[in-house]
């Protein structure tokens, strides 16, 4: 008797040659839309083309076709990423001082760009040490390359060429999986199989191969580099892999091979799979052996996780069952129906992924400085500041994107007729309570957090320092944060007896790591100043959430516009004759949310930049005396608004303002130019559409008089187009201004 699995053994999951490959459509801009394909009557056409080119929902209602387009576009995105990476590695190979930096990372700055000397631009190539003139880079690539065991510019060349090959492979895959073998909808909806492959394959085998590389290549090469061996003398990576004796000289347990593994005598491997905690005093980075251990552990977890979901064999978890079982006494139907939402609405799926990835990115920002993973990263202050700022901005944008796609899901994909009394429906039914409470929280946080600052400014102005909230007068110590710090500082002796140091030196415990006379990391003291600014963080984040959540919960309907769902995701007003209904679309909430996201992240990166310069970064004398860059002025200066303006913004802007005539002058120009871009945005944000239409008609009249009128009729931007252009320039200008301000400052003083 034969027992067959209920599933057929082979599922045909692709369609062959579904879409003919043809370049004819490339010559027809807007081929995806009947109206746009007709060509331009007015200048609005070019804006509509940009708005809808990637909105696959508007091209077709067929979910399978939309899925294939998204899938194919992902390969295009990967191709661009590989191309960008290839460019980075090529710059390292062709234009950088990587080999010089590798031999003396404490005295030589990383540089991978040399500006050609056209009309006196020689000034931009500053002296980064070791006789090399170029632009100091702050991307952290040098530190990553050293950690991964790259010892020569030839290796960077080879990697750059490899990345180019991968880029072309990805381009090919994008074409192949749309035109030649396109997956069926069922393949995109097979979530258990997807989970197994992504968890076990991408994360599990990915981490395992990285752990293998770190153990067999990175660790031995970094051992030699730390010992001061000339990079040219170090054996090449493949020699360590092929010749076990080489490794056994550095790590004696390698001679025993896999025996300790199978005899469960795992402690033998502790010399290269360590559990130390803290930082390597030579490089100021995490112990590479700790990192290898971490990736091995992660790999095992994800390899197990990748075998948990039910596919062809009828055992394991089914996601639908898990979601439908997920209900409590107060949650009605719970997550019933969520499985159907997430397998038919890619906006809902994307929204969740963006929210999680955005939060993770912000967590990464905080770990990059508190647990610096790469050698000589912690003492490269410019790179530390850049990495923190970069990851904070990216995280902020991703979280706003999560709200945007949640709202698009609500408008386009949500079906209220089939959803009753599940969690989403229950949230929507008491959305008034949620939003009004959240609004109260925002008002409370706003008045109280700013109230503390205004109190301090007033007392300071009246010469009454004894009545201020500060560490030396009325203390508002962050006792809960300090408790968390102490808990973690004490953990090695209690919850993690194998570790010699806590996870991060920032927790406390008095230990300091300095590399080449510069502070890598030390315990970060928290006081009244941090308590104040943390409540500003709470305020700005809650307002951002209020705006975005209101946009999602009221995306389909509101008391003001009950039929909002019929108007779509973005619309200017609810038609003529209904005053006071403009700027209520879900799109407008995303637009407003972006400004508050910008507020939130700006305060965070300002706080970080000043706090680190004041209390962490600096030099250490032979006697062990630490001199911080701004001499610890954060605790007393940042407790007033005036202090932020005077001692942070103004005092630290002197480097960028005075950069003309120096190798930092490009930052001075960017500072000026980005201010201009930012100011340009206000023209779009503060003026109405009719104003521009009147102006345009005057100008068209003049063109007609001169008989040079264009065939395409000029039109003012629509309300939404104008706001989109405005917010784009506002954010671009603001972020680039901050970038120039930060880098000119930290490169000059760091």
Swiss-Prot record:
It is a multi-pass membrane protein. GO terms for cellular component: chloroplast thylakoid membrane; photosystem I; plastid. Chlorophyll a' binds at residue 675. It is an enzyme of class 1 (oxidoreductase). It catalyses: reduced [plastocyanin] + hnu + oxidized [2Fe-2S]-[ferredoxin] = oxidized [plastocyanin] + reduced [2Fe-2S]-[ferredoxin]. Phylloquinone binds at residue 692. Pfam families: PsaA_PsaB. The keyword NAD does not apply. The keyword Iron applies. Keywords: 4Fe-4S, Chlorophyll, Chloroplast, Chromophore, Electron transport, Iron, Iron-sulfur, Magnesium, Membrane, Metal-binding, Oxidoreductase, Photosynthesis, Photosystem I, Plastid, Thylakoid, Transmembrane, Transmembrane helix, Transport. Its main location: plastid. P700 is a chlorophyll a/chlorophyll a' dimer, A0 is one or more chlorophyll a, A1 is one or both phylloquinones and FX is a shared 4Fe-4S iron-sulfur center. The chain crosses the membrane at residues 70-93, 156-179, 195-219, 291-309, 346-369, 385-411, 433-455, 531-549, 589-610, 664-686, 724-744. It is found in: Plastid, Chloroplast thylakoid membrane. GO terms for biological process: photosynthesis. GO terms for molecular function: 4 iron, 4 sulfur cluster binding; chlorophyll binding; electron transfer activity; magnesium ion binding; oxidoreductase activity. Disulfide bonds: none annotated. Chlorophyll a binds at residues 683, 691. InterPro entries: PSI_PsaA (IPR006243), PSI_PsaA/B (IPR001280), PSI_PsaA/B_CS (IPR020586), PSI_PsaA/B_sf (IPR036408). [4Fe-4S] cluster binds at residues 573, 582. Its EC number is 1.97.1.12. The PsaA/B heterodimer binds the P700 chlorophyll special pair and subsequent electron acceptors. PSI consists of a core antenna complex that captures photons, and an electron transfer chain that converts photonic excitation into a charge separation. The eukaryotic PSI reaction center is composed of at least 11 subunits. Belongs to the PsaA/PsaB family. PsaA and PsaB bind P700, the primary electron donor of photosystem I (PSI), as well as the electron acceptors A0, A1 and FX. PSI is a plastocyanin-ferredoxin oxidoreductase, converting photonic excitation into a charge separation, which transfers an electron from the donor P700 chlorophyll pair to the spectroscopically characterized acceptors A0, A1, FX, FA and FB in turn. Oxidized P700 is reduced on the lumenal side of the thylakoid membrane by plastocyanin. PANTHER family: OUTER MEMBRANE PROTEIN, OMPA-RELATED (PTHR30128), PHOTOSYSTEM I P700 CHLOROPHYLL A APOPROTEIN A1-RELATED (PTHR30128:SF19). This is Photosystem I P700 chlorophyll a apoprotein A1. The lineage of its organism: Eukaryota, Viridiplantae, Streptophyta, Embryophyta, Tracheophyta.
């Amino acid at each position: 008797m034969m027992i067959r699995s209920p599933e057929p053994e082979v599922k045909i999951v692709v369609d062959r040659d579904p879409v003919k490959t043809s370049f004819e459509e490339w010559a027809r801009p807007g081929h995806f839309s009947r109206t746009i394909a007709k060509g331009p009557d007015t200048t609005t056409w070019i804006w509509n083309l940009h708005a809808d080119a990637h909105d696959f929902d508007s091209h077709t209602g067929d979910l399978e076709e939309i899925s294939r387009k998204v899938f194919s576009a992902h390969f295009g995105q990967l191709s661009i990423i590989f191309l960008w990476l290839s460019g980075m590695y090529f710059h390292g190979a062709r234009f950088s001082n990587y080999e010089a930096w590798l031999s003396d990372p404490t005295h030589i700055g990383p540089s991978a760009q040399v500006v050609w000397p056209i009309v006196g631009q020689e000034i931009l190539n500053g002296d980064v040490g070791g006789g090399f003139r170029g632009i100091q880079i702050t991307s952290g690539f040098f530190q990553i390359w050293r950690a991964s065991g790259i010892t020569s510019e030839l290796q960077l060349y080879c990697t750059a060429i490899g990345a180019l090959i991968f880029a072309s492979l990805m381009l090919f895959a994008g074409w192949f999986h749309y035109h030649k073998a396109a997956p069926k909808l069922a393949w995109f909806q097979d979530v258990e199989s997807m989970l197994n492959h992504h968890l076990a394959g991408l994360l599990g085998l990915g981490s395992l191969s990285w752990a293998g590389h770190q153990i067999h290549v990175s660790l031995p090469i970094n051992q030699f580099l730390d010992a001061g061996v000339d990079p040219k003398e170090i054996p090449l990576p493949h020699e360590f892999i092929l010749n076990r004796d080489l490794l056994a000289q550095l790590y004696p347990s390698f001679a025993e091979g896999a025996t300790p593994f199978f005899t469960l005598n795992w402690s033998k491997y502790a010399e290269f799979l360590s559990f130390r905690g803290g930082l390597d005093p030579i490089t100021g980075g995490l112990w590479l052996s700790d990192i290898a251990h971490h990736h091995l552990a992660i790999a095992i977890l994800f390899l197990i996780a990748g075998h948990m979901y039910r596919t062809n064999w009828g055992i394991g978890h089914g996601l639908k069952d898990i979601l439908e079982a997920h209900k409590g006494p107060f949650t009605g139907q719970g997550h019933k129906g969520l499985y159907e939402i997430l397998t038919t609405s890619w906006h809902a799926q994307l929204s969740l992924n963006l929210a999680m990835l955005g939060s993770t990115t912000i967590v990464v920002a905080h770990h990059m400085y508190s647990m610096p993973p790469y050698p000589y990263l912690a003492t490269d202050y410019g790179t530390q500041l850049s990495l923190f700022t970069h990851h904070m901005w990216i995280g902020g944008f991703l979280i706003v994107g999560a709200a945007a796609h949640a709202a698009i899901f609500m408008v386009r994909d949500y079906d209220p007729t089939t959803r009753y009394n599940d969690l989403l429906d229950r949230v929507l039914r008491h959305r008034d309570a949620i939003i009004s409470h959240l609004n109260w929280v925002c008002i409370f946080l706003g008045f109280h957090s700013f109230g503390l600052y205004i109190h301090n400014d007033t007392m300071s102005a009246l010469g009454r320092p004894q009545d201020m909230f500060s560490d030396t007068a009325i203390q508002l110590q962050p006792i809960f944060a300090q408790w968390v710090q102490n808990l973690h500082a004490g953990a090695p002796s209690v919850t993690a007896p194998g570790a010699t140091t806590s996870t991060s030196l920032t927790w406390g415990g008095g230990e300091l790591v300095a590399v080449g006379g510069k502070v890598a990391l030390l315990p970060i003291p928290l006081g009244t100043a941090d308590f104040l600014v943390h409540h500003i963080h709470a305020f700005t984040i809650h307002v951002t959430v209020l705006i975005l959540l209101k946009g999602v919960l009221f995306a389909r309907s509101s008391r003001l516009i009950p039929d909002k769902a019929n108007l779509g995701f973005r619309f200017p007003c609810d038609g003529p004759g209904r005053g006071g209904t403009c700027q209520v679309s879900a799109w407008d909430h995303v637009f407003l949310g972006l400004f508050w996201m910008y507020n939130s992240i700006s305060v965070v990166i300002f706080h970080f930049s000043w706090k680190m310069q004041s209390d962490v970064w600096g030099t250490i004398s032979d006697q062990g005396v630490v001199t911080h860059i701004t001499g610890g002025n954060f605790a007393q200066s940042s407790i007033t608004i005036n202090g932020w303006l005077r001692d942070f913004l103004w005092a630290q802007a002197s480097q960028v303002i005075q950069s003309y005539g120096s190798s930092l002058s490009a930052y001075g120009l960017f500072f000026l130019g980005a201010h201009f871009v930012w100011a340009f945005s206000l023209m779009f944000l503060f003026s109405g559409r009719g104003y521009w239409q009147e102006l345009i008609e005057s100008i068209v009249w003049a063109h007609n008089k001169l008989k040079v009128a264009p065939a395409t009729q000029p039109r003012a931007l629509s309300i939404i187009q104008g706001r989109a252009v405005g917010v784009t320039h506002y954010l671009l200008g603001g972020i680039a201004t901050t970038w120039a301000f930060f880098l000119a400052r930290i490169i000059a003083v760091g």
